[in-house]
Amino acid sequence: MPSFDIVSEITLHEVRNAVENANRVLSTRYDFRGVEAVIELNEKNETIKITTESDFQLEQLIEILIGSCIKRGIEHSSLDIPAESEHHGKLYSKEIKLKQGIETEMAKKITKLVKDSKIKVQTQIQGEQVRVTGKSRDDLQAVIQLVKSAELGQPFQFNNFRD
């Protein structure tokens, strides 16, 4: 029986490249001359910390980072950007988490979405991925289109497609 896996992964190497590129853009921006502004990647915790002197500049840095991520093929929805910024002395900062893997709640939403669509396939939650099996390739491709078109707030990849 044909099957495939629905996963949500980010290549940390591409994230590192995006952060380095954003720092390069930051160093050439005229409005950030003489301003203490830093974008740092913590690969262990899978977070990006942005620090600068004002709230407005913080939003500008986030826009620079998002632009760099999109150029590197990382979707905006894979960044979990907090609404409130932290204020320490004269510095403002935000810690952006990278969304890796599919949490159980999201996996249940995907399973419910597929079951409600009445496509003749079975779904199984396997850790941080969802396996979809069906009798025909067309059913599996319909599930791929269904999940892509659903606004679930997280990017998904479809791999391990087997006949």
Swiss-Prot record:
Disulfide bond entries: none
UniProt-listed Gene3D superfamilies: 3.30.70.860, YajQ-like, domain 2
GO CC annotations on file: cytosol
UniProt entry keywords in alphabetical sequence: Nucleotide-binding
UniProt GO molecular function: nucleotide binding
InterPro entries: DUF520, UPF0234-like_C, UPF0234_N, YajQ-like_sf
Family from the record: Belongs to the YajQ family.
Function (record text): Nucleotide-binding protein.
Domain-level remarks: Composed of two domains with a four-stranded antiparallel beta-sheet flanked on one side by two alpha-helices.
Subunit-structure text: Homotetramer.
Protein name per Swiss-Prot or TrEMBL: Nucleotide-binding protein YajQ
Species: Haemophilus influenzae (strain ATCC 51907 / DSM 11121 / KW20 / Rd)
Gene responsible for this protein: yajQ
